[in-house]
Design a protein with these regions (language model features):
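Sec/Tat-exported extracytoplasmic proteins
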Residues: 20, 27, 145, 211, ...
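Metal-dependent amide/peptide-bond hydrolase catalytic core
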Residues: 197, 201-393
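Non-cysteine beta-strand/loop elements that form the S-adenosyl-L-methionine
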Residues: 76-78, 175, 180, 331-336
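Structural motif
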Residues: 73-76, 123-125, 151-154, 329-332
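Histidine/acidic-residue-rich, glycine-tolerant segments that coordinate divalent metal ions
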Residues: 60-63, 83-96, 100-101, 116-235, ...
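Acidic/His- and Gly-rich active-site-bordering loop/insert found
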Residues: 2-96, 100-121
């Protein structure tokens, strides 16, 4: 099987590299990845997949399926292709998180596995999931039941230096505080004003005080998006936004309400009116299916990849977390550089263009496909994955 997978990977490599490179050269922000999603869909159609696009109301989402006439498990590979603002040429978007390569890896894994399902039975599904960096299409997909007919979902993210097994991520929710005060001349009639900027500053102060009583896994970080227009005018309208994160979604719910109270208290203290809203979708924590995680590691070893590291400790938040509560899921990492380069940088984006990165991309796609093959052909493996997932619920 190793030889077959390696041979297929060689056959499709030029197309997969071209896909990754084209998206690198034409970076698109979340929900406007029109060319990127088009390129994904066209390549999958070329290799016999039936593609639905747009998908679930998202213009840049898609679902590509290769179905056997025989029954069997349904294996999903999730693809991302959104860029980050400010990391490209002339301050435009750029692929500082390597999603050009991430998406190509999932497409490659789907194509490789599709070569076997006519014999084994089952489905191969490649899901195009826009806007991971912001709105997180996987959240909407999970809410709409997209993953409920799938037996396993995989996605592998580029990183530096080492391979890492799938680990944890932080649950995350968002909140925007919009304060309404009353303008006045800041020197001649300050007593006539109600200072919306004071409310914003007090919100930050309240949250900073809250940090003393939060758990070690809690993270709260925010920005001021509107802070007034002139120094001699008391600001009448100011806005701030926060990400609120925690290790588990149950604690996040409690922490989020505490942050809400910080904003309410600031409004009360300053006399401002307050409107609140989430400005992005909430992400659940990632509940890695360890049986599937071990299977991926085993599959990579079968292809000659040793030294896969335990999960890292630098937790962010991923929309795959929402998937992990409705379908057995893993989110491991593969290296695209031999030196430590931070993500969300121009240097990391450039690393996706190296031969080393492209070798690891194809290697990883093969491992994902081989893990899928084991599920398709080994009922006991699928049973163990399902058993662990049911215990999560």
């Amino acid at each position: 099987m190793k030889q077959k997978i390696t041979q297929i990977a060689k056959e499709i490599r030029a197309d997969i590299e071209a896909l990754s490179d084209a998206i690198y050269k034409n970076p698109e922000l979340g929900n406007v990845e029109y060319e990127s999603s088009k390129l994904h869909a066209e390549l999958l159609k070329k290799y016999g997949f039936k593609v639905e696009k747009p998908y679930m109301g998202l213009a840049t989402g898609y679902r590509a399926e290769y179905r056997s006439a025989k029954p069997g498990p349904h294996i999903c590979f999730m693809a991302e292709y959104d860029a980050l603002p400010g990391l490209g040429e002339h301050g435009g978007p750029g692929h500082g998180c390597g999603h050009n390569m991430l998406g190509a890896t999932s497409v490659a894994a789907g194509i490789i596995l599709s070569r076997f399902v006519d014999e084994t039975g089952g489905w191969v599904v490649v899901l195009g999931t826009p806007a991971e960096e912001t709105d997180g299409a996987k959240v909407a997909y999970a809410n709409k039941g997209v993953f409920r007919d799938l037996d396993a979902a995989m996605i592998c993210h580029p990183t530096s230096v080492d391979y890492f097994k799938s680990g944890k991520s932080l649950a995350m929710d968002t909140i925007e505080f919009e304060f309404f005060g009353r303008a006045a001349h800041a020197a001649s009639e300050p007593e006539m004003g109600i200072n919306a900027l004071d409310a914003v500053i007090q919100t930050f102060n309240n949250i900073n005080a809250l940090r003393q009583q939060t758990r070690p896994d809690a993270r709260i970080h925010g920005i001021i998006t509107e802070g007034g227009v002139a120094c001699n005018v008391i600001p009448e309208h100011c806005v701030c936004r926060f990400y609120v994160r925690a290790g588990k979604k149950a604690y996040l719910k409690h922490l989020y309400q505490q942050v809400v109270n910080c904003g309410k208290a600031a409004a009360l203290a300053t006399g401002c009116e307050l409107k609140m809203r989430p400005f992005e979708l909430a992400y659940d924590d990632l509940a890695t299916n360890e049986t599937l995680n071990d299977l991926f590691e085993q599959s990579m070893k079968e292809l000659g990849v040793e030294g896969i590291q335990p999960p890292g400790e630098d937790y962010g938040s991923v929309d795959a977390g929402n998937v992990s509560y409705v379908c057995p899921t893993i989110h491991p990492y593969f290296p695209i550089t031999t030196e430590a380069i931070p993500g969300h940088t121009r240097e990391f984006a450039a690393a996706t263009q190296t031969v080393y990165a492209k070798d690891r991309m194809m290697e990883t796609a093969g491992g994902m496909a081989l893990a899928g093959y084991h599920i398709l052909t080994e009922p006991d493996t699928l049973k163990a994955i399902r058993k662990e997932f049911k215990a999560l619920k």
